Amino acid sequence: MAVEEGQVLPGHALPFVGDCRWLISLDYDDTLRSDDAEQPVSDSFYELMRSWRAYGVRWGINTGRTLPYLCSELLPTAPFLPDFICTCERYVYIAQEDGKVSPLVEHNQRCYEHNMCVRESVTPLLHAQLLLLRQRMPELQWIIAPDDPLSVEAENSQTMDAIMAFLAPFVSSLEGVAPQRAGRYMRLADSRYCKGSALRSVAEQWRVPSSHWAIIGDGHNDLRAFQLFPEAFCGAPSTAHPDVLAWLADNGGCISSTPGVMEILYTWKPLHMTES
């Protein structure tokens, strides 16, 4: 079943009783997601989330992917839905009392309208800069995303490093606009919306303070969330971008010795979680 941005998701989150005490926000690509195409999220992760219900834990995926792109891979093998999903670093979907995961309609519409204004005003300016980039650094391999004129897809993360360095003076001159970067992908967006602000919108629904959040991710869009909420438990897999690893090392965050999220989650539990 195809899923479109803005719809109620098919399926249900696990039943939840009592107050939400803890929130776990997980990046998807290169963090929660494994390389196993047949089982992109491990059974052991789902079983852990099931067992942590007793601690008042809700969990979700906070990604730069669109909802259709995420769900096309996640839903066929997921035994239950996340309690929340944040897509494109801004749109929010949250589990209701019946377990259905539904969009925060007013929030999402506001995000859409604000970002359409950015698209209208910034697209010609960005494309002029990208033309200069093509002329001055023709060896770099990249494209403008076919479905978003403010998104750039590079050959690899190192190429995106070079692109971001070239665009930095231009981006810093834009009022109310910020880059959202994940590895080899980057989009310009309204600076009011990012993974951190999306997670805050989720937490407000369940009244969970940021000191009771765990934020796990590997990219610059996750780093921005770490910087906005350093009081949260922040962690990254061993494969995270060097900028992310450096910030965590300097600020007492958790760096896994392996790819994935399980080691980080097992580190977080004894430090913070107790049964009510």
Show which residues each predicted segment covers.
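Non-catalytic pre-domain segments flanking phosphatase-related domains
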Residues: M1-Y28, D36, S44-S51
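Mg2+-dependent phosphoryl-transfer enzymes with acidic/Ser/Thr/Gly-rich catalytic loops
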Residues: D19, A189, G196-S276
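Short glycine-/acidic-enriched loop or helix-start segments at secondary-structure transitions
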Residues: D35-D36, L70-S72, Q96-E97, A225, ...
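Active-site phosphate-binding/coordination module
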Residues: V41-L140
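Short, aromatic/basic amphipathic alpha-helical patches
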Residues: L74, M164-F170, P242-G252
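Conserved acidic, metal-coordinating active-site core of Asp-based
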Residues: H127-L228
